[in-house]
Design a protein with these regions (language model features):
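Binuclear metal-ion centers of metallo-dependent hydrolases, dominated by the metallo-beta-lactamase
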Residues: 258-280
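Conserved AdoMet/S-adenosylmethionine-binding subsite of the radical SAM
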Residues: 93-196, 203-243, 248-255
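Amphipathic alpha-helical segments in well-structured domains
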Residues: 59, 101, 225, 258, ...
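Canonical Radical SAM [4Fe-4S] cluster-binding loop centered on the CxxxCxxC motif
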Residues: 18-61
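Short, charged low-complexity linear segments at domain edges
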Residues: 2-27
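Conserved alpha-helical substructure of the radical SAM core
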Residues: 46-82, 96-99
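Short glycine-rich or small-residue beta-strand-to-loop segments that form or flank ligand, phosphate
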Residues: 83-88
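Conserved hydrophobic residues forming the short capping helix/wall of the S-adenosyl-L-methionine
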Residues: 70-73, 108, 269
Length: 280
């Protein structure tokens, strides 16, 4: 299966299903992946298969490369709709993330003041005050919440270290509405060893298939959607973005959520008074 490792520190522009013409900012090494999650659906592949040998780009390198690219795009008359922190892993892991945010906002204001600054994050670093404050300064603070079920999170998102979804939700509330929730909905069955299944004798709500060697990773059912929606209502985001698999994944057996499933979930979010988009 093919996976994507993005150039660093600037790549694109690319057309984003959710954001428009996006110029990417990758704060991770150009030859590998650095992430506090290890999602079975990640287009960049598994962490252990893409260990980087190059260092993180420096703050100065990011600013210089971004300015060079924006100058080039301005000369060509093609400015981006959005400057997006994405790439090979979790951008907020970079030790100079807050300072780089300030540099990017300054360059945006200089070269493309109509463009938005967006950050795609898995939410694992929002307990850091400097990261929280930096995310408050961007236009689109897009934070992941695939489910509120801790076993599903362990089996599918594979967080490194301790991850308490209830604490994450509380920290999301602390953005006081300056937050966009992003959620991956998917279907399918995978081999247990591929999910790294962490089962418990009791309280395991993940669903078994007829083949006990396989595990369902479907989070489109009511047992997942209903508590997720209640968490979304409590967070009170400015918007919700739901989406499904769009590219090849490192784990076989994953399936896209259907248009009908995504539309039904989207409509429930909208009915709760929260703007929501679905990407298929």
């Amino acid at each position: 299966m093919s996976t994507i490792i993005y150039p660093s520190p600037v790549f694109g522009p690319v057309h984003s299903r959710r954001l428009g013409i996006s110029l990417g900012i990758n704060l991770l090494p150009a030859d590998g992946k650095v992430c506090s999650f290890d999602c079975i659906y990640c287009e960049c592949g598994f962490n252990e298969d893409h260990r980087p040998t190059l260092p993180l780009p420096t703050r100065e390198e990011v600013a210089a490369k971004l300015e060079e690219k924006l100058q080039q795009m301005a000369a060509e008359g093609q400015l981006p709709d959005v400057l997006t922190f994405a790439g090979n892993g979790e951008p907020t892991c970079h030790p100079n993330f807050p300072e780089i945010i300030d540099d990017v906002i300054r360059l945006r204001d200089q070269y493309c003041p109509k463009a938005k600054v967006s950050v795609l994050s898995n939410s694992t670093m929002i307990h850091r005050q400097a990261v929280h404050d930096a995310l408050m300064r961007v236009d689109n603070n897009i934070l992941k919440l695939d489910t509120v079920d801790p076993i599903y999170i362990n089996n599918v998102d594979h967080p490194n270290g301790t991850y308490d979804v209830n604490l994450i939700i509380d920290r999301m509330k602390a953005f006081n509405g300056h937050i966009i929730i992003q959620t991956m909905f998917m279907r399918g069955e995978v081999r247990r060893q591929e999910t790294g299944v962490r089962r418990q004798e009791s309280g395991d709500r993940s669903r078994e298939t007829g083949d006990r060697s396989r595990e369902s990773v479907d989070n489109t059912g009511e047992e997942y959607v209903c508590p997720w929606l209640e968490a979304v209502k409590a967070i009170k985001p400015q918007q919700v973005m739901i989406y499904t698999i769009d590219r090849e994944t490192p784990t076989q057996g994953l399936l896209k959520a259907t248009h009908e499933q995504l539309d039904a979930i989207r409509d429930r979010v909208i009915a709760a008074g929260i703007p929501c988009t679905a990407s298929y």
